Amino acid sequence: DGLSGDIWFFTIYLCICLRENATSPFFSSHPWAIWVLAVTAGIFHAKQAATADYYRQFHLYFLKGEEGSELDSSVVLRKKYDEMPWRGHFWSKLVLFFYSNYTANQEALSPAMQKLRAELQRVFKGGTASKAFRAEFRKGSLPLMKYTNILSFNWRSIALFVSILCKMPWLYFIFELVVLNGILVYMISRHEALCRRLTKELKAGKFQA
């Protein structure tokens, strides 16, 4: 869903740039400006959406288990990609290529979370985490879910529609760079701190039963 959303918003960004260069006196005189703004916002958009989606899936993993979550591993996905032949699987392999890179980007933005996943694998031997751990993680993660919602589709759409109604679509890029990036930094800081604490407690022998 996150990867599809990136493609969807790419078309929106493109349309905003074309519209502003055609109708705005400032951007008509400086056509490069809107493109620089759009590319910068787009880069951060991808990071915001990917991180929000990843945190949400990790939360669902401890709430509903594997069946209720789409939590993946780039290592596993890359192995599937390497083992899948191009012949007869062209589109599936192409999608897997982009999705494995998308997942790798999510993992790169959450180093403490990756250490926590590795420690969970070690402590619980690849099985289900203890009830005590799952409860403790959900307790710390739940307050952050409101930020994942803000960084998702609905709030972006509202900001986009407001900027269009104000006849200043470029304001959406400013909203993304200033407001959403601020939320992203805060959310990552909180989530990584949670993961570091739980990793330390797991190593100390807590949540074993």
Report each predicted region and the residues it spans.
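Multi-pass membrane catalytic core of lipid/isoprenoid biosynthesis enzymes
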Residues: D1-A49, L160, L165
